[in-house]
């Protein structure tokens, strides 16, 4: 399954594309940060980010678009920008008939690190391990978008048997968390995510 993750932001919008396989391994396809100038008119900024997201969607043809769920912040202008870009992303996905997954930051952190309060460096470190990258993805918008894609792919994989393909191509000499996960049931991070999901359902 190909997932396109979006870390929404008006100045910097991270977009990460990941292939997730039936053995829960994952492969990096692409990662970009769509940028706009803070001095530009709002409608031009929204159009620029929307065009950037849609260009990547059309290029990579994902099955699912995963977007960070908006949550309250002290900085009203920041949360408004995030909400506006989220709307742009959702419209683009709907226009193409794509499934959408919304995840809170704590859900994503729990999925990839096993800890819902992990900091950005911990998230980036685990994303690099899962994808078998030689360096941490930067900036944080990029690693957050990839983490969203991984989280959505693992959730889809645990909700139905088999995702796209059987096993990711092997990268010689690169150790990753996915290697230990292959064929061995949920990883520790996935198990933590499942526990968090069950706890959330219990509070509803």
Swiss-Prot record:
Catalytic center residues: 7, 68, 141
Organism: Clavibacter sepedonicus
Cofactor(s) essential for the protein: Mg(2+)
Protein's recorded name: Crossover junction endodeoxyribonuclease RuvC
One Pfam entry name: RuvC
InterPro entries the record matches: RNaseH-like_sf, RNaseH_sf, X-over_junc_endoDNase_Mg_BS, X-over_junc_endoDNase_RuvC
Binding positions (Mg(2+) 2): 68
UniProt cofactor note: Binds 2 Mg(2+) ion per subunit.
Quaternary structure note: Homodimer which binds Holliday junction (HJ) DNA. The HJ becomes 2-fold symmetrical on binding to RuvC with unstacked arms; it has a different conformation from HJ DNA in complex with RuvA. In the full resolvosome a probable DNA-RuvA(4)-RuvB(12)-RuvC(2) complex forms which resolves the HJ.
EC category name: hydrolase
Gene that specifies this protein: ruvC
Chain residues that bind Mg(2+) 1: 7, 141
Molecular function as annotated in GO: crossover junction DNA endonuclease activity; DNA binding; magnesium ion binding
GO BP: any one term: DNA recombination
UniProt keyword annotations, A-Z: Cytoplasm, DNA damage, DNA recombination, DNA repair, DNA-binding, Endonuclease, Hydrolase, Magnesium, Metal-binding, Nuclease
GO cellular component terms attached to this protein's record: cytoplasm; Holliday junction resolvase complex
Enzymatic reactions: Endonucleolytic cleavage at a junction such as a reciprocal single-stranded crossover between two homologous DNA duplexes (Holliday junction)
Subcellular location: Cytoplasm
């Amino acid at each position: 399954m190909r997932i396109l993750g979006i870390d929404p932001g008006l100045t910097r919008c991270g977009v990460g594309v990941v292939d997730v396989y039936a053995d829960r391994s994952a492969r990096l396809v692409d990662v970009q940060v769509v940028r706009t100038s803070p001095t530009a008119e709002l409608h031009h900024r929204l159009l620029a980010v929307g065009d950037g997201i849609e260009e990547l969607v059309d290029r990579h043809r994902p099955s699912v678009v995963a977007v960070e769920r908006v949550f309250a912040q002290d900085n009203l202008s920041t949360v408004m920008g995030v909400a506006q870009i989220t709307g742009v992303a959702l419209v683009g996905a709907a226009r193409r008939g794509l499934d959408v997954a919304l995840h809170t930051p704590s859900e994503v952190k729990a999925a990839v690190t096993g800890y819902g309060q992990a900091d950005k460096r911990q998230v980036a470190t685990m994303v690099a391990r899962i994808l078998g990258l030689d360096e941490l993805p930067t900036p944080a918008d990029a690693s957050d978008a990839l983490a969203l894609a991984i989280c959505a792919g693992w959730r889809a994989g645990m909700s139905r048997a088999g995702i796209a393909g059987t096993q990711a191509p092997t990268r010689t000499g690169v150790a990753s968390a996915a290697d230990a996960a292959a064929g061995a049931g949920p990883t520790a991070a996935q198990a933590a995510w499942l526990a968090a999901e069950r706890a959330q359902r219990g509070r509803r």
